[in-house]
Amino acid sequence: VKRPMNAFMVWSQNERRKIMDQWPDMHNAEISERLGRRWQLLQDSEKIPFVKEAGRLRLKHMADYPDYKYRP
């Protein structure tokens, strides 16, 4: 069972697609670096919808898998 997505992952899912559409040959490592820098530049107020969605996903995950324990 995968862990629920955090706010960055929720945001980056759509942003990654946009970058891949513009630069299909860009390596995944470079895309990830760009996404990380862009996320850090966002204001806290811009992150709120993604934080809320991540919270919703976390609650759903807890309901779906009540005995879940993260084991790396």
UniProtKB/Swiss-Prot annotation:
It is found in: Nucleus. PROSITE patterns: HMG_BOX_2. One of its GO terms (biological process) is neuron differentiation. GO terms for cellular component: nucleus. Keywords: DNA-binding, Nucleus. InterPro entries: HMG_box_dom, HMG_box_dom_sf, SRY-related_HMG-box_TF-like. Its main location: nucleus. Residues 1-69 bind DNA. GO terms for molecular function: DNA-binding transcription activator activity, RNA polymerase II-specific; RNA polymerase II cis-regulatory region sequence-specific DNA binding. PANTHER family: SOX TRANSCRIPTION FACTOR, TRANSCRIPTION FACTOR SOX-12. This is SRY-related protein MG43. The lineage of its organism: Eukaryota, Metazoa, Chordata, Craniata, Vertebrata.
